[in-house]
Amino acid sequence: MISRYINGLGIALVIVIWGVTFASTRALLVDFSSFEILVLRFSLAWVALWGIERLRGSANVGKWRNEWIFAAMGFTGIVAYQFLENCAIYYTNASNVAILVSFGPIVTALMARALTKDRQLSARLVGGSLISICGVSLVSLNGIVEFELRPIGDVMALCAMASWGLYSILIDEANERGINPLVAVRKSFGWSLIMMIPVAIWGMTESGICALDGSFAVIVDAGVNVERFSNLINWMNIAFLGLLASAASFVLWSVVCRIFGVVKTTISLYLTPIVGVIFAAVFLGEDITILEVVGGGVILIGVAIATTVKGGVK
């Protein structure tokens, strides 16, 4: 029982960290493009996990037979998910993206039921998820009725959601094969960085720099780089995103998925907007509105329903 509570705290820690990433990323966007942040973040994470592996000794990953899993994890959980979400925000508004992506846990549950041995899909889980989605909508819209269908961006947001669902299924596959989560995550980061190389080259060209308001720009100007990389706050945010939000959180997420199952673990993602609102209020001085409080309460009720059974918490 104690170990389950400890693992539950692990989920809470990941949610808190991921809830803060929005503010950290927003601070870095003053000096860096979205793509540059992505590369810096996962490069640092890969180096950190590689160093830990060397200190612990090489882990058995089954030679090359598991590489397709790592490559697929890198593509679905990092490259496709991050790119689709960033592009979706460009073509639609942030509220649309937040609401559409919040359907992720239900989609993940459906995928898990169809493709894995995970059978946690139930009426309570679906009902709780729908209640949580209503809460996310209240927090995201915050009294401004601005949800309108914008096909290109909305489809991208839905694809991002589906991509994360596939990543969750791949985590389950890696766990079923007994692969060390640290190894699986580190290798998936490596594959994602390899896949980003063509985008990085394109980002140095004029068309790449101008695309999506500079979201994919890669700045090679020495003067600009000296200035932005000499900023201590930038390094603190990069370290947070790379070491905590990527290296530590992705490994811990894989561990708790092994213990609780990908469906129940993914339900906890509904709590991320609550953390984001609280962090913005405490550290950025933003006001918390009545709708955000109500929305947060609705999310908590939905999560409680989705993660319990008649006899109590699963």
Where are these regions (language model features)?
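Specific transmembrane alpha-helical segments of multi-pass solute transporters/efflux pumps
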Residues: I17, T21-F22, W50-V101, C134, ...
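Transmembrane alpha-helical segments that form core, pore/gating elements
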Residues: L49, T108-L110, E146-I219, L252
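Glycine-/small-residue-enriched transmembrane alpha-helix faces in small-molecule transporters
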Residues: M1-V39, F75, F147-E176, I194-I201, ...
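Juxtamembrane helix-entry segments on the extracytoplasmic side of multipass membrane proteins
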Residues: S3-G8, D31-F35, V39, G62-W68, ...
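Hydrophobic transmembrane alpha-helices of multi-pass small-molecule transport proteins
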Residues: L49, A71, M111, L121-G143, ...
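Specific alpha-helical transmembrane segments that line the substrate/conduction pathway
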Residues: E36-V47, T76, E85-R124, S129, ...
